[in-house]
Regions:
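Serine-esterase "nucleophile elbow" of acetyl-processing enzymes
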Residues: 5-66, 76-84
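Short histidine/acidic/glycine/proline-rich micro-motifs that form metal-
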Residues: 31-34, 38, 64-68, 95-97, ...
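Residue-level signal for threonine
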Residues: 42, 69, 181
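Alpha-helical cap/lid subdomain in secreted, periplasmic
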Residues: 56, 72-203
Length: 203
């Protein structure tokens, strides 16, 4: 199941002005960016609303860029670090897989980002993805193993599959079969909140 498609052009979201609350940076691709959704429907937008409703004082900084690979993420890593995040949700890699980029390259890029965020004092939550069956079992196996391997090596929280309960469900997906619709984004946010809760003291 494909999770996202490369975008012809993508403009990074502008960081929010600091307001005293610690930052949760969502560093990802089109799933984070809310491709195809109305304003306020992306899962990072929903996450902010959820945090506010729970009285958890964090600000969510959405740095999702449609079409980004892990190499693209490295190129804008300094922008994310400038936010001095307390927590980073790292949601990259699916576009690497869809473009046939070797999993070893993806792994090295993600490792470099994790190390940079951890060195800056941020806790990392790694969002795992997967690929459509037509990419072949061996390629998919190597791709899937990257996330679990990195989570174990760097002792970071892992969401095994960010699109669990969404991907492959027509009522949760847009017509392209790649991106979550509004209902799907809500499901993704629930998974993210579940992973974040122990880190932020949320109930």
């Amino acid at each position: 199941m494909a999770q996202k498609a490369p975008a012809a052009a993508a403009v990074p979201a502008k960081p929010q002005a600091p307001d005293g609350r610690p930052a949760i940076v969502v560093f990802g691709d089109s799933i984070s960016a809310g491709f195809g959704l109305d304003a306020g429907q992306s899962f990072p937008d929903l996450l902010q609303k959820d945090l506010d409703a729970r009285g958890v004082k964090y600000r969510v900084v959405n740095m999702g860029v449609s079409g980004d690979t892990t190499q693209d993420g490295l190129a804008r890593l300094s922008i994310a670090l400038a936010e001095r995040p307390k927590i980073v949700l790292l949601e990259l890699g699916a576009n690497d897989g869809l473009r046939g980029i070797p999993s070893s390259v993806m792994q090295a890029n993600l490792a470099q980002m994790i190390e940079a965020f951890q060195s800056a004092g941020a806790q990392v939550v790694l969002a795992g993805m997967t690929l459509p069956p037509n990419y072949g079992p061996e390629f998919i196996k190597r791709f899937d193993a990257v996330y679990a391997g990195l989570a174990e090596k760097y002792h970071v929280t892992l969401i095994p599959f960010l699109m669990a309960g969404v991907g492959g469900h027509q009522d949760m997906m847009q017509r392209d079969g790649l991106h979550p619709n509004a209902a799907g984004a809500r499901r993704v946010e629930e998974l993210v909140m579940k992973a974040l809760a122990p880190l932020i003291g949320a109930r």
